């Protein structure tokens, strides 16, 4: 199976990773069957999905705890494990991020907070190192949390062998350059799908220049690109889909019309629409890592099918043209 580098690190991994936000449960995702999610993570590794991504804020530590339980039953060397730092609810800071299930979550990118985050994550995950550590959200006030301090803390953790690669999520091109100026940056994690392509112009040129990998989250646009959503599909009050621009009537119709053009390709490649979309998304940007969420073995198996799709050049060109036409 073809593998991709993670930035300038020595880590190589297949393009498809497993996101575990939903495994955290809570009001965003509802109750979670933890035993089933442990099996889902095991299934992912068995199917060749080696990059498992989590974060402390997913379920307020719950996702990390479930991932840690799964790792007890998996050869650690077979897993590329990433988590995040910089969101804090152990104490209050001047920067409120959001309220999650009644808990006020703050941003804190100080060296002390980052080091404490990593030590706590290592304990919950039951491992002695992280393959990738992301800063989850960036500070809106670099006077409060200087980027140099943030990067130096991560570089120190790398020197200690507690992390292998440095990542950042939800960044700007200027911040990417700042990370590299003060230390290094191997990978960024950003929202990217066939419907949400802003990073192609805003971030990708800088990443290419500096040898930084990109990992895309939400490639199926919260399920809109799976082929299972219709114009009549509704979502519960409070669902983030209701405020997602891609789910608004005009854009939703564009998305569904786009998928309808590819029905013949799902037959040709004997795959689901979701698998076809994942395979194409991986082709949109050379070397792109794609992160797909799942919390059941069945969902994992559906995502993993994308690893076996080898798009013909002509089909890829046709599909990219279709995508460009609605961008």
Which residues does each PLM region occupy?
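N-terminal binding-site loop/beta-alpha segment at the start of enzyme catalytic domains
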Residues: 1-80
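Acidic (Asp/Glu)-rich catalytic clusters
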Residues: 8, 70-76, 123-126, 179-183
């Amino acid at each position: 199976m073809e593998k991709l580098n993670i930035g300038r690190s020595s880590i190589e991994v297949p393009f498809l990773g497993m996101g575990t936000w939903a495994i955290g449960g809570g009001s965003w995702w509802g109750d979670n069957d933890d035993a089933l999610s442990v099996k889902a993570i095991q299934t992912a590794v068995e199917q060749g999905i080696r990059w498992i991504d989590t974060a402390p804020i997913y379920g307020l530590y719950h996702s990390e705890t479930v991932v840690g339980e799964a790792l007890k039953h998996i050869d650690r060397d077979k897993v590329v494990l990433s988590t995040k730092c910089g969101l804090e609810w152990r104490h209050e800071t001047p920067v409120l991020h959001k309220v999650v299930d009644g808990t006020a979550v703050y941003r804190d990118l100080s060296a002390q907070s980052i080091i404490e985050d990593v030590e706590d994550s290592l304990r919950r995950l039951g491992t002695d190192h992280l393959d990738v550590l992301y800063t989850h959200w960036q500070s809106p006030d670099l006077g409060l949390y200087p980027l140099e301090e943030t990067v130096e803390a991560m570089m120190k953790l790398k020197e200690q062998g507690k992390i292998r690669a440095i990542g950042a999520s939800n960044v700007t091109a200027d911040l990417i350059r700042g990370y590299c100026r003060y230390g290094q940056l191997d990978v960024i994690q950003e929202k990217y799908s066939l419907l949400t392509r802003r990073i192609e112009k805003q971030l990708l040129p800088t990443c290419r220049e500096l040898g930084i990998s990109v990992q895309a989250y939400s490639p199926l646009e919260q399920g809109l690109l799976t082929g299972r959503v219709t114009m009549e599909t509704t979502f519960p009050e409070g669902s983030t889909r209701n405020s997602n621009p891609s789910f608004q009537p005009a854009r939703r119709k564009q998305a569904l019309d786009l998928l309808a053009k590819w029905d013949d390709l799902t037959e040709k490649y004997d795959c689901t629409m979701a698998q076809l979309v994942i395979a194409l998304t991986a082709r949109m940007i050379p070397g792109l890592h794609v992160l797909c969420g799942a919390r059941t073995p069945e969902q994992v198996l559906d995502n993993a099918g994308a690893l076996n799709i080898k798009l013909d050049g002509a089909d890829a060109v046709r599909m990219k043209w279709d995508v460009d036409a609605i961008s």
